Amino acid sequence: MQIQLGANLKPYHTFGIEQLAAQLVVAESIDDLKALYCSAEWASLPKLIIGKGSNMLFTCHYTGMIVVNRLNGIEHQQDDDYHRLHVAGGEDWPSLVSWCVEQGIGGLENLALIPGCAGSAPIQNIGAYGVEFKDVCDYVEYLCLETGTVKRLTMEECQFGYRDSIFKHQLYQKAVVTAVGLKFAKAWQPIIQYGPLKDLSSDCAIHDVYQRVCATRMEKLPDPAVMGNAGSFFKNPVISQQAFARLQIEHPDVVAYPAEQGVKVAAGWLIDQAGLKGHQIGGAKVHPKQALVIVNTGDASAQDVLMLAADIQQRVFNCYGIELEHEVRFIGESEETNLKQWMSEQA
């Protein structure tokens, strides 16, 4: 392993904002991870494991070590009823989805073009167009930082929720995802009840769903390689049935979906209807085609993004009485932070 000192983080996160890390290293094996996390030499140094850096914003320079997960490899097994994949944590997620479609393996096509690595998928329980990671998860393997051993969790043990998992709670900063196990029924059924997939026929093919999802994302979502962004910036808020009924009276065209604990309201709709598409602070801007995305127009600072996010949050609350929660992870100088904490520090 080669450790970079004073590394520029711009190439390592999709917002593409200039920040530095005291140290940065690429891990290509579990032994690399063990050496970094479990040896006395590095024990006291703050560490952050990243994949593609596609769901994070570095709010300032990072004083610890950035560990880039580049564990690679895909193993495929099958029986009469199921395809099973064992995927290393550093595998590129969009490439994995594309590979599955090429192999005729259905189940991931709704999750096409979500930037990131396989190891990040269970942490966030990524989802799109009616499918979440938990729906295809068989197990997750992780390096336990307390024991230095690789452990396996079943899907149920991962405690998946909406953009949530055990890795954000009980195992936060105690685990590094090394691999995921995926399970796909050969009796594939398309999930086409959401958005632009609704007009696909029930007898459509895996490739049809994949192409539609890709076309939709490329039309509505900016390419991070061209315009820096971290995808959906805010979570879709879940509100009670009573609160939704009140909201519907004033806004009968509100976009929402049933959820386990109430109604999930489209955050993009809330931001759009608050008149914030194209709203800009410094080099940070609400994307004119997709209000849920904040983009770096080329010279944005982290403060620009944070100020814009806070402004969006306040305006949406003023309009609808709904507080948006950011989906993007905020990384401070040595640990994860959040918008409320950042705002209190500015006061």
Swiss-Prot record:
Reaction(s) this enzyme catalyzes, per UniProt: UDP-N-acetyl-alpha-D-muramate + NADP(+) = UDP-N-acetyl-3-O-(1-carboxyvinyl)-alpha-D-glucosamine + NADPH + H(+)
Domain (FAD-binding PCMH-type): residue spans on this chain: 17-187
Catalytic residues (positions): 163, 232, 327
Localization per record: Cytoplasm
Co-factor(s): FAD
Enzyme class per UniProt: oxidoreductase
Matching InterPro entries: FAD-bd_PCMH (IPR016166), FAD-bd_PCMH-like_sf (IPR036318), FAD-bd_PCMH_sub1 (IPR016167), FAD-bd_PCMH_sub2 (IPR016169), MurB (IPR003170), MurB_C (IPR011601), MurB_C_sf (IPR036635), Oxid_FAD_bind_N (IPR006094)
Top-level taxonomic group: Bacteria
Major subcellular site: cytoplasm
GO annotation terms (biological process): cell division; cell wall organization; peptidoglycan biosynthetic process; regulation of cell shape
Key words, A-Z: Cell cycle, Cell division, Cell shape, Cell wall biogenesis/degradation, Cytoplasm, FAD, Flavoprotein, NADP, Oxidoreductase, Peptidoglycan synthesis
Function: Cell wall formation.
Protein name: UDP-N-acetylenolpyruvoylglucosamine reductase
Source organism of this protein record: Vibrio cholerae serotype O1 (strain ATCC 39315 / El Tor Inaba N16961)
